[in-house]
């Protein structure tokens, strides 16, 4: 899954335009309902995104040490407001409300990468949001 996310970022040329995109990552824990980051796919992805500005939100897990290009925040609304690339890395139940928050902010030109299909595609499916999930084009 983590390599799939990275391939989408490469395909959309997000990695090569480091100042154009603000990347928001939803989920740091290795799975939902835990605060453990051991074997977290997010940490592997962060190592590959060291040239990009990253904001992370997780309701339970915290970064154990500071990572140069990363800022962990405790407000999902703020992350969604400042990010134009949003990646779901842990399928927390709380993230199901992301589509409604994005709709409320009326955000445009968003790239939403959701390997777990936790986001309600019927709400986010519009001309302003480019939605990627495993198994759907």
Indicate residue ranges for each PLM-predicted region.
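Structural/interface elements that position substrates and couple domains in central-metabolism enzymes
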Residues: 1-137
């Amino acid at each position: 899954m983590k390599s799939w996310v990275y391939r989408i970022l490469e395909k959309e040329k997000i990695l090569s335009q480091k100042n154009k995109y603000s990347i928001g990552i939803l989920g740091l824990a290795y799975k939902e309902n835990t605060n453990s980051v051991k074997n977290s796919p997010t940490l592997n992805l962060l190592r590959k995104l060291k040239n990009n500005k990253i904001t992370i939100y997780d309701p339970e897990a915290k970064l154990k040490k500071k990572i140069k290009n990363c800022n962990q925040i405790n407000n999902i609304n703020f992350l969604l407001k400042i990010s134009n690339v949003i990646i779901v890395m842990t399928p927390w139940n709380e993230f199901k409300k992301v589509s409604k928050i994005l709709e409320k902010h009326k955000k445009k030109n968003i790239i939403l990468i959701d390997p777990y299909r936790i986001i309600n595609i019927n709400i986010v499916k519009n001309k302003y949001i480019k939605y990627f999930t495993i198994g759907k084009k």
